[in-house]
Amino acid sequence: MRAARELLKELEYEVLSGSVDINVNDLVYNTAKITKECLFVCIKGMAFDSHEAAAKAAGAGAVVIVAERPVEVPEGITVVLVKDTRYALALISAAYFHYPARRLKVIGITGTKGKTTTAFMIRSILEHAGISTGLIGTIETIIGDRHIPADNTTPESYAIQEDFAQ
C-alpha cells in the first residue's frame, strides 16, 4: 500500500473531495484495469475521455480520482484536481515505482531519422563494455535478456517507469 499524499507530493493539486491521507493499492489509468483501492488517473484520449468514466472507476474500486476537471463520483471518494493529467500520471508513476530513473543513467535519443539504429548501436557499445543496459524503443523494450514487443510507438509514462524499475 502507498499513501496517496506521497504519490502526489511532486504535483500542484487541489483536493475537491475526500482526503489524500488515504492508502492506495495500485495506480491505474485504464478503465478496464481498475482494481480495489486504486488511485485512478483520468486521461483524455483521442477517442475516449476517462473523465466521463470516473463514477464507473469509483464503483469498480478506485478510492482516489485524479482529474483535470470536476467529476461526478459517489460520496467518500477522493477527487484531486490537476492542470494536466498526463503530466500528473508521469510524476505519480515515478513516485509509485520509487523514482527508478534516479538510480539509472538514461540516454535519450531524438530526431527525425535513425533513432532506433542509434539506440541499438549505443546498447551494443555499452554491452560490449560490460555495462548492463535496457532499451525502450518503438519496436520493443529490452530489459536484460527479455525482449518485449512494443504495444505503442510511444509508451505511457506508467509503462516507462515500470520498465525503469525492472
Segments (PLM) and residue ranges:
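N-terminal leader/targeting and accessory segments in enzymes
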Residues: M1-L91
